[in-house]
Amino acid sequence: RGTLVHMVTTLRIAQDETADELLSSDPFALLLGMLLDQQFPMERAFAGPAKVKERFGSLDPAKIAAADPEKFADLCATPPAVHRYGRSMAGRIQAVAEVVRDDYDGDVTRIWTSTDDPAEIVKRLKALPGFGDQKARIFAALLGKQLGVQPAGWREAIGPYAEEGSRRSVADVTDETSLQEVRDYKKA
């Protein structure tokens, strides 16, 4: 797996040092955090990949894709669960791992580094299991705002989530204060 390109800062999404270090250093962990970010508190969703790594011993997409589905589901559902719907999300994690393994040679960063077209990046993210248009745009905004993945026209291709200074999504979370501002925005 590749490393994140143009790393700008250490991410502070999970509000947990170990989980945030993993999100900052492992792009597949970051993608899985985004996958888990639904019907579950944002910081707990982004702490999920650290739980998977601790319990499974690896975040290698090929190993996760090849894991026994029942055992992997048990690992994700064991309290404290990786997600509120741990067993269901285990299947999605494995499905995303399979796509990364098969379509991107196991290197998740190829989703965004093998093209300069921001619309193509969004399209590739949207095609991942468990990702719709909104989730794809939020993750692309996160890549752009916090990790420096900013091909020409990226803000226009992504839309409102890419707006400078916005507090709409996880793409805007850099500390506890911004996390609360995003929460307040979502409640409004």
Across the structure, where does each feature detected by a protein language model lie?
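C-terminal accessory module of base-excision DNA glycosylases/AP lyases that mediates lesion recognition
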Residues: 2-20, 25, 118-126, 133-188
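Structural motif
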Residues: 18-29, 39-41, 83-88
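Short, aromatic/basic-rich helix-turn unit that serves as a nucleic-acid recognition element
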Residues: 31-35
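Short alpha-helix boundary/capping elements
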Residues: 39-44, 57, 101, 147-148
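Short Gly/aromatic-enriched secondary-structure transition segments
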Residues: 46-52
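Alpha-helical ds-nucleic-acid-binding substructure associated with the helix-hairpin-helix region
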Residues: 52, 56-127
